[in-house]
Each structure stands twice: as C-alpha cells, then as structure tokens.
From Swiss-Prot:
One of its GO terms (molecular function) is L-serine-phosphatidylethanolamine phosphatidyltransferase activity. Residues 1-23 are annotated as: Disordered. Catalyzes a base-exchange reaction in which the polar head group of phosphatidylethanolamine (PE) or phosphatidylcholine (PC) is replaced by L-serine. Is essential for phosphatidylserine (PS) biosynthesis and PE seems to be the most plausible substrate. Plays an important role in microspore maturation. Keywords: Endoplasmic reticulum, Lipid biosynthesis, Lipid metabolism, Membrane, Nucleus, Phospholipid biosynthesis, Phospholipid metabolism, Transferase, Transmembrane, Transmembrane helix. Pathway: Phospholipid metabolism; phosphatidylethanolamine biosynthesis; phosphatidylethanolamine from CDP-diacylglycerol: step 1/2. It catalyses: a CDP-1,2-diacyl-sn-glycerol + L-serine = a 1,2-diacyl-sn-glycero-3-phospho-L-serine + CMP + H(+). It is found in: Endoplasmic reticulum membrane; Nucleus envelope. Belongs to the CDP-alcohol phosphatidyltransferase class-I family. GO terms for biological process: microsporogenesis; phosphatidylethanolamine biosynthetic process; phosphatidylserine biosynthetic process. The chain crosses the membrane at residues 42-62, 79-99, 105-125, 197-217, 227-247, 296-316, 321-341, 361-381, 390-410. Residues 1-16 have a biased composition (Basic and acidic residues). It is an enzyme of class 2 (transferase). This is CDP-diacylglycerol--serine O-phosphatidyltransferase 1.
C-alpha cells in the first residue's frame, strides 16, 4: 500500500504526463535508465543521512571531534542544521509546477529559499555593526568598509590629457563587472517574464530608479551615455534580445521526448541527457496588463517586486560593506534566479486561473517574504548612512506619477462600469 503523499504525487505526475502528450501511467512511461530516480526512497535516504551525521558529529567517539574553538564548533553545527533541513526539503517539501530536471531539484530550491528567509530574519534583529561583522562568517574578506565607486565623476568620453588611454572613462565602464552583469541579468529576466514590452518597462524603470537614488548610492551616479547608451540601448537590449530569442526557440520546438536508453547512439544519449535540463513543455506566459484595471495592478505589482529586489542588491551591498566582486553577491543573485523561475510560473498560473477562490503558490509567498525582509534590512541598516535629502524635483516627479496612475485607474474603472451599465439596460 502506498503512502498517501506518494499517491498524491503519482496522481500529479500522471496528470503532468498527460499534459505533455502521454496518456499512460508515469511509471510505465519512464525510461528504465532513470526510473530509479523517481521512486521514493525516503526511509533509505534517512538512514544514510543518519549514518553521515554519526560520522560528522562524532556521536560514537566524542573525543575525536572535541574542539577547543567554539566558533568552529558553532559553524559546523549551523552547517549541519542547514544540511538536515535541505535533505528534508529534497525529500518531503511540496512539489512545484516544474518537473525538469527533476522535481526534487525544485524542492531543494524551496528549502534554500526558506533558509535564506530565516537567515535574513536573524540578520534583521542585529545591530548594523554586528551584522557587518557577522558577514565575515560567510566570507573572510567581508566586514571591512570599502569605498564605493562613482561612475559619474568624469563624464568625458574622450580625455585628451590622459597619458595612456584617451578613452579611459569609456574603457573602464565597458570592462566593469556590471557590464556583463547587465547582459546576463536581462537574458535571465527575459526567460522568466517572456514578454518584451514588460521587459522594457522594467529596463527603463530601473534606470529611472538609479536617477532617483543616485544621491544615496555612489554606484547610481552614472554619466548620461553610460545610463542611456551602454545600459539601456546596448547591454539591456542585447540581454533582452538574447533572452527572447531563447524563448522563441523553445516556443517553436516540438517536444517529443524519448528515453535515454532508447537513443540509437552515444551522441543521442548525450543530447537527451542534456535535454533533461530544458523544459518538458514550453508554456506561454500571457500577462495581458491591459485586460482590465485589476490585471494592470497585478502586473504592476510584479514589476514593483522585480525592481525592489534589484534595488535591494545595491542597498544591501552598501550597508553591509560587500564589494561588487565578492562571491556572496553572485550567490544571492543565483539563488534569486532559481527562486524566480517557479515564482514567475506560479504567479502567471495564478493570474490565468479562473477560479473565484484561489491563492498564490508557496514560491510566490516566499519570494514576497524575502523581498520584504531584505527591504526592512536596507531601511534599518541604512538609517544615518544617507545624509543627503532626496531632491525636490524627484519627489515632485514621483508624486505626479503616482497621482496620474491613480487618476488613470479610476478613469479606466469608471469607463468599464459605464459600459457594463449600458449593457444591462
């Protein structure tokens, strides 16, 4: 007799199998070479994990693992806690709508998101100086104040008096780490959102936010040609183009999956193995922001959250003294990208669901929670770090945008209600 959770999982996998073009039981459709990976072995893995804990903790030989260094013992204990929780998530966390390369991968990402949320909550309750020193436990180079680079100190493209390179300013900007970060970042966002107008709204919106907060962060103080030409027209455009090209490639592809063991040669087996890391089927994310006022607000909320997560990167980096090239920045971005993949799918499914009563998925909840706690950390640790007040013209501009948006939504709603009233007559 199967456990109740496994029966539910099998029914879900069978439903997904039928959606992908298969009509039979998933177990019969699985390739013999990979069928073992889809069979539950939770008890076996629990016992293996227990054996690993016995070895790592020295439970049977306490003297061999005794350490006089309290910090080392605490570090090992914390990493063991994280490993146990991730193992639980890998085996027992709720599955998502994604099944490639394996549902367990996304359960593991779910566990990583929970750990990140809990760690951020712990950091939120610390003092700013203590939090900065705490970052040393993540990387030994952290906890040291570093000067922030300003890109708008000299906006000349051609510097005739420079001794070695007359295009020094342009050279330094192009070969800065943020140049490639823009390209790969927008390629990843295009794969997530799959809507070119929405991507351009985000691209231009973030540049406007850089102008808004450049009095607070030196990184945002950019030259006009850096912000408009290099960022928007070159880096962001190329990243969006490459991402949408990837989207169109998978959208036009015919998905007829054949098992690895049934491939005729080694090349076919290698291609099929690599294909396991691509989507099982490609769904179009239809956002339709102009479908109605409420849908417009829902899509606008998605844009605001995306932009807030991006802003949090720079404010966290500034307040916690994390240099741009430190791997902690890269780890956070990779984790956020992994979290955003199922989050975007869940949110789009939520918008397209016609049920009167519905709720967002677990990843949507986690993403919003992480975004909020990151923002609270930026606000708390940023207190007193930004002595320059926001310019009056910036406040006036965004106030006007907010009032205009409210007026637009009210007018739109009034017109719809007027049309519906006429139809009832």
């Amino acid at each position: 007799m199967e456990p109740n959770g496994y029966r539910k999982e099998r029914r879900k996998e069978q439903h997904l199998g039928r959606m992908n073009g298969g009509g039979g039981d998933v177990e019969t459709d699985l390739d013999p070479w990979t069928a073992w990976a889809y069979k539950p072995r939770t008890i076996s893995l629990l016992l293996i994990g227990a054996c690993f804990l016995i070895w790592a903790s020295g439970a049977l030989d306490p003297d061999s693992t005794t350490s006089d260094d309290l910090v080392t013992s605490v570090k090992r204990g914390v990493w063991a806690m994280i490993a146990v929780f991730l193992a639980y998530s890998l085996l027992q966390a709720p599955s998502t709508v994604l099944i490639r390369p394996h549902p367990a991968i996304w359960r593991l990402v779910h566990g990583m998101a929970v750990i990140y949320l809990v760690a951020l909550t712990f950091l939120l309750f610390q003092r700013r100086d203590d939090a900065r020193q705490f970052m040393k436990f993540l990387h030994p180079d952290l906890g040291i104040e570093l000067p922030e680079k300003s890109y708008g100190a000299d906006c000349r493209i051609y510097v005739p008096d420079h001794p070695t390179n007359r295009f020094k300013n342009l050279y330094d900007t192009v070969f800065d780490e943020f140049f490639l970060a823009h390209i790969f970042g927008w390629w990843g966002k295009a794969i997530l959102i799959r809507n070119q107008p929405l991507l351009w709204v985000l691209s231009i919106g973030f540049e406007l936010l850089e102008v808004t907060f450049r009095h607070m962060l030196p990184n945002f103080n950019e030259c006009w040609w850096d912000s408009i030409v290099l960022d928007i027209l070159i880096c962001n455009w190329f990243g969006i183009w490459a991402g949408m090209y990837t989207v169109r490639y998978f959208d036009g592809k015919t998905y007829e999956w054949v098992g690895i063991s049934r491939q005729p040669n080694i090349i076919g087996k290698v291609k099929r193995t690599l294909g396991q890391f691509t989507p099982a089927h490609w769904d179009k994310d239809e956002w339709h922001p102009l479908q109605g006022p409420w849908r417009f607000i829902q899509v606008l909320t998605l844009c605001i959250i995306f932009l807030t997560v991006e802003l949090n990167t720079f404010f966290l980096k500034f307040s916690l003294w994390i240099p741009p090239r430190n791997p902690v920045i890269l780890y956070r971005l990779i984790l956020w990208w992994l979290i955003a993949i199922p989050t975007t799918r869940e949110y789009n499914s939520y918008l397209q669901d016609r049920k009167p009563v519905k709720k967002v998925g677990a990843f949507c909840w986690l993403s919003l929670g992480i975004c909020i706690v990151e923002l609270l950390i930026c606000i708390k640790f940023g207190s007193g770090l930004y002595p320059t007040e926001m310019p009056l013209w910036v406040v006036t501009l965004w106030g006007s945008v907010g009032l205009g948006l409210v007026a637009f939504l009210l007018s739109w709603t009034w017109k719809i209600q007027k049309i519906l009233a006429q139809k009832r007559r």
